[in-house]
């Protein structure tokens, strides 16, 4: 059974228990679909204080992660993952992660993730060892651990067998370039709000059409930029036009 190996270099490996012990990612680990190992640069320091950071040259606020502990941790991660493993640094300066990138990463056999802290890591480490830099958005976090967990969760969902239903990943938002449609469950009526009749009809063709139309409409209203990069079929254009017309008439 094929599996994905992910090595994480982080000063806070305990944070990744959220991945290994809970939810879909935990199930993937237990099933052998995902192999997750963390490496702490502090374990590769030689001074009594286990120093992993220092002041930046040129002055300025904050501290910068030192090269040597990172490199030594990376050596161990490479031995575990193999020399072909892609090294990814989670950084606000990186390319923004999207579903297309997640699909590509899910095809890898092994990935090494670098979770920085403080003001960042020494640029010489990035130049020498990092293959790609990825960001999860235009905002600043305290470290790379949360972005790394976001990436791991998103990639794990696409591993064959990770989800309970084979179609679940394909029906998620962004998988086909659209936002997801609304979902409902029991009861049929709650606080005088009814589930749309089409979902109770049992007509699978009508349900598929309704869900596609809702996805198109939501994307148009909330993320119109996604439609600019997606070529709509004739059916999709018709459904979107109907959605807009019905919305404007209501």
Curated annotation (Swiss-Prot):
- Signal peptide positions are none
> Does this UniProt record's set of keywords contain Transport?
no
Among Gene3D superfamilies, the record links this protein to: 3.40.1280.10, tRNA(m1g37)methyltransferase, domain 2
Localization:
Cytoplasm
What is one GO cellular-component annotation here?
Answer: cytosol
Q: Which reaction does it catalyse?
A: guanosine(37) in tRNA + S-adenosyl-L-methionine = N(1)-methylguanosine(37) in tRNA + S-adenosyl-L-homocysteine + H(+)
Q: Which GO terms describe its biological process?
A: tRNA N1-guanine methylation
Q: What Gene Ontology terms describe what this protein does at the molecular function level?
A: tRNA (guanine(37)-N1)-methyltransferase activity
Q: Which UniProt keywords apply?
A: Cytoplasm, Methyltransferase, S-adenosyl-L-methionine, Transferase, tRNA processing
Q: Report residues binding S-adenosyl-L-methionine.
A: 116, 136-141
Q: What is its EC number?
A: 2.1.1.228
* Main location (coarse class): cytoplasm
Q: What Pfam families does its record include?
A: tRNA_m1G_MT
Q: Does the record bear Cytoplasm in its keywords?
A: yes
**Which SUPFAM superfamilies does the annotation name?**
alpha/beta knot
PANTHER family the record matches: TRNA (GUANINE-N(1)-)-METHYLTRANSFERASE (PTHR46417:SF1)
- Tell me, in a sentence or two, what this protein's role is: Specifically methylates guanosine-37 in various tRNAs.
The entry describes its oligomerization and partners as: Homodimer.
What family is it from? Answer: Belongs to the RNA methyltransferase TrmD family.
Protein name (database record):
tRNA (guanine-N(1)-)-methyltransferase
| Organism for this UniProt entry | Pseudomonas syringae pv. tomato (strain ATCC BAA-871 / DC3000)
